[in-house]
Amino acid sequence: MTDTGYTEELLPGTFDALSVRENGGNTESDTSSIRKSQNQDSKQEDVHRENLSVQTLEDHTEVTETREQSVSKDLFDLPRAPASLDVKGLQESDEDHYVKDLSDYKSMDPGKPGTVPTNVSEIFNSNQPTLDEPIQFTRVSSSSVLSESISEGDADLISHLEGKVEEGNNLTSKETPGTIESIVGDKTMSTIEGSSQNIGRISTGGRMTPDLSLMGGALETSSDFLNSTQTSNSPKITTPITEVDANDVYESPLNEILSSTDSFNKASTASADHSKHVSVHEVIPEEEPHPETTNEDPPIKTPVMVNNFFENQTPVSESRSPFRTISSPFSSLRKNVKSQHGTPDHSQRNSNSSTSSNDVKRKTGTKKKGVFSTFVQNIKRNSHSEKRISSGSGNGSGNNAFKISTPYNAKHVYHVGVDSKTGEYTGLPNEWEKLLTSSGISMKEQQQHPQAVMDIVKFYQDVTENSGEEKVFKTFKVGGGSGANIASTPSFRTPSTASVQKFETPQMQTDATFPNENNDTPYSSNLQGPLLTNDFSETVNNEKFIPTRPAPKPQGSSTVSRRVEIPSPINSLGHGTPKVQRSDTQSSSIFSFKKMPTLKSEQPLPPIPKAAEKPANLLPARAAPTPPKPAIPTTPEQSSIPAIPSGLAVEVKEESNTSNVQTRKAQEKKREERKRKNQQIQSKLTEICTTGDPSKLYKNLIKIGQGASGGVYTAYELGTNASVAIKQMNLEKQPKKELIVNEILVMKGSKHNNIVNFIDSYLFRGDLWVVMEYMEGGSLTDVVTHCILTEGQIGAVSRETLKGLQFLHSKGVIHRDIKSDNILLSMNGDIKLTDFGFCAQINEVNLKRTTMVGTPYWMAPEVVSRKEYGPKVDIWSLGIMIIEMIEGEPPYLNETPLRALYLIATNGTPKLKDPGNLSHKMAMFLNWCLMVDPEDRGTAADLLEDPFITEIAEENTSLAPLVKLARMKKLAESMEDDENDEDKYDEQS
C-alpha cells in the first residue's frame, strides 16, 4: 500500500463502494502489479467487512446504553411535548459528496449543539440542491435510516448478536402477503424511503415539522423531492416485502434501537425548547400545494403529533384555505381502520414506505418498530375519559342553555286533490274519510258527485259545531224599493234546524240605510246597539219585522283546497228570492235587493191586533238581531306564533312585555264595554218587562222541559184559566242578551192566529220569564205517528202553515225549520207555528227528532249545498212535511244523516213510495213545493191560491178528533212504558 492507498468512504445505503485516491505515485503497468492490486483489493474488502461489523457492534452498544438512560428519564417526563425540527434532507450531489460514516447520521437533534459531525455540516454547506421547504413530521429516528442502509448479509450477521426485545417494546403487526400493516404504540408513523443500493439517489420519505416560531411564508418544494414516486391524488405508499409465515414470530435485533434511539430522545427533549404546545383546537398552518406540473407530485405529509395526541393525516387535496383544524386523533384513526379493514382495529395501521424506482427491487427483509405500549394505553384511557367528561358536560350545558318546547296551537291545513284517473279525492282528513265511510256513501257515488260530497261534509261539520247554540231570528229584506242597500259583514253562520238550538245572525254594519215605505226618503238607524237608544217614537204603521240582511252569498267557485279548510264558517246561506249581489269590499258587502217577483205588491198585510199598538212605537228596522261578532277563522299564517327561546335578546322580551300590556289593556277595555252593555240591556229589559212575581200570577206550574239556560213550564193564568207556557231564562247564562231584547220587542209588535203569540214577560230576581201561548194538543208529530190523515186534513194543515209562513215572510223572517215537531195544535184543531226564534222555543222537546240525527231530512237542497237561500226554503220544508203526513216519516229517515244530506243534494225531488194514491191536484201542489230550483218553487202567497188549498183542504175542526186520538194513544204508550219499568224494577229487586 505504498503506491496506492484505499480509503473507505461509506455511502448511505451501500457498503461495497470504494473510492480510489491517488497519493501522487506512478502506477505500474505490468501484469504482476495488476494481479497484486487485485489480491490487495480482495483482502481490503475482507478487512472492510470486519471493520464494518466491529463498527456496527460498537454503535449498537453505544445506542443501547443511551437508550437505557433515556428510558429511565422518560419514565418521569411522560408525556412529552411534540418535537419540531428544522432538518434538511440528505441528497446525493453531482460531485459525489458522501457521508463518511454512519455514526455521523445518528444524531440530528438541533437541541444539542456540538454533537453534529463535521461531515454533515460539509454536506449542508455543499452546492447540491436542498429541500428549502420545511417538512411536517412527528419523530424521525436515525435508526430507521440505519436499518435501511444495512444489507441482507450484514443484517444476518447482526441478528446473531442481538437478544430478544423487551415485552413493552414488542411490535404488534398484521402481516399480509406483500405488505405489512402495522401501527406503532404511540400512534405515530414514519415514511421511510430508500433502496439497498444508494440512499442518496432517493428523496427523503419522512418530512419533519419545522419549529413554529421559525416558520415563515410558503416555501418552494425541491424538484428532487417532488420526483419521488407516488400518486398525486392519494399518495399512500406500501412497501412490497416478502411473505412472512403468520405462525413464525419474527424478532428483529434492531427493535430496541428502532424503538428508542438517541435521535428519538433528543427530538423529544428539543421539542420543549423549539416548539410551543399546540392544543387540540389550534390551527397549524399548512403549506399551500403547488399547481401540478410535469414530473411533480404533491408532497407526502407525515402524521402530526399535537399535545401528545397523534393524528394519521390522510392526503389532503388542493384547498383554498392554507389552514386546517387539528381534531381528535383517534376519530380519524378509527375512520381509517374501518375503511381499510372493515373492523375498528385500533392496534393496526399501514406502515408506508416508498420505492426508489421501478427497476430497483428492495432486498431488505421485513422490518418492525417497537413502541411503548403502556404509554399508548395510558393515552387511550385518558383520551376516552376526557371525551366522556366533555360529552357529559356538553349535554348538561345544552340542557341548561335552552329547552325546546312542544308545539302549541298547531293547525293542520289539508290540501285535497282529485285523482284524474279514478276521480277519487286524495288527501282528505281522517275525520272526513270516516264520515264518508260510516255514512254509507259509496265510492261510486263520491266519484259521480264529488262537489256535492264536499258540500254536505262541510255543512255537516258546521252544523255539528253550532249544535250548542240557541236559535235566533233569521231575517231577510222584503219588498219596498229596489234601491235599498244594506251593509252586512261578510261572514255568516250556517243555518240549522230546530233541533240545533243555536243560530247566529251576522252583525249589521253600524250605519245601515233602510227605505221608508211611507215615503222615498231613506232613514238611517244605528244597528250596532239595537234597541238600546231612546229613539223609539216613530210609528210602525204595519211595517215588516226586521228588514235586515239578505241571504248570505256562498263561496262560489272556490277551489277544492279552499273548501276543505277545517273549520271555517260557511259563507253561503241562501239562494233564490230575493236576489243578492255582493260587491267586493274589505269589511262589509253591499247588498242590493230587487222586488220579489212572486210577492203580490197590492196584497194587504194581515192586520196587527190592537193589543200590539202599545209597543208599536218601536222601530222594527232596529230590531235586527245583533249577536257578538263571530270569530274570524285565522289563516295558517296567523294561526300560531312559535315559542320564543329563553336565550334571545332583551329586545324581544321587551316587545313581548309591551304586547302583553297592550293585550291586557284591550281585555280590560272589552270587559268594561261588556259591563256597560249589560247595564244597558238590563235597563232596557226593565223598561219593556212587567214587574212582579210571575209565580203569583199563574198557577199549577208544571215543568215540561229543561234547556241550557232554564226550564219550560205549563201553567194557567189566574182569572182567565188560559193555558200558557212559561220559559224561564237565567240572564247571566245568556251569551246574547241583546237578541232576547230584540225578540221580545218583535213578538210584542206582532200577533197572528197561526203564530204562537207572546203574552207577557217578567224580570224577577235576575231571571227573565217569557209567557207565551200553549197548545195543549201537542205537536203534529204525535198525530202523524198515531193517525192516518186524509187529503182534506193534510190540506187544512198545509193551509194554516202557509198562513203563518206568509206572515213571517212578510215581516222578513225565515223560519228555517218547518217540520211536524214545530207545528202545534190545540184541542180544537187550531194550528200555530213555533220555534221561529229564541224565545219561542217552548214546546216539549222530542230528543230523537231534535238532535242532529233528525234534523237534515227537511232541509232544502240549497241549504245542504251551502248556496244562497231565501224564504222559499220554508216552502220546501212544507213539501217534505206533506210527505211526512202521507207516509208517516220524511224521506231518507232510515239513512244516516250524512247520506241523507247527500241524497237531498243529488236526487232532487224525493220520490213517494206509492205516488198513485195521490190525487192530481195534491200531486201538483206537492210538486210545486218540491221544485229543486228555488226560482220555480212557489211562494206562500201563491200556494194559498192553489186549487188543492182552495178546493180540497178541510176546516180546522176536522183535526180535533185526530188530536184527541193521538193524545189517548200517547197516554196509553206512556202508561205501558211505566208498567214495563215497574216490572223491570220488581225483577231487579
Curated annotation (Swiss-Prot):
Pfam families: PBD, Pkinase. Signal peptide: none annotated. Residues 1-78, 265-400, 567-588, 620-681 are annotated as: Disordered. The active site is at D817. Residues 42-77, 273-293 have a biased composition (Basic and acidic residues). The lineage of its organism: Eukaryota, Fungi, Dikarya, Ascomycota, Saccharomycotina. MAP4K component of the MAPK pathway required for the mating pheromone response and the regulation of cell polarity and cell cycle. Phosphorylates histone H2B to form H2BS10ph. Residues 404-417 form the CRIB domain. One of its GO terms (molecular function) is protein serine/threonine kinase activity. Residues 698-949 form the Protein kinase domain. GO terms for biological process: response to pheromone. It comes from the Eukaryota. This is Serine/threonine-protein kinase STE20. SUPFAM superfamilies: Protein kinase-like (PK-like). One of its GO terms (cellular component) is nucleus. ATP binds at I704, G705, Q706, G707, A708, S709, G710, G711, V712, K727. Keywords: ATP-binding, Cytoplasm, Kinase, Nucleotide-binding, Nucleus, Pheromone response, Serine/threonine-protein kinase, Transferase.
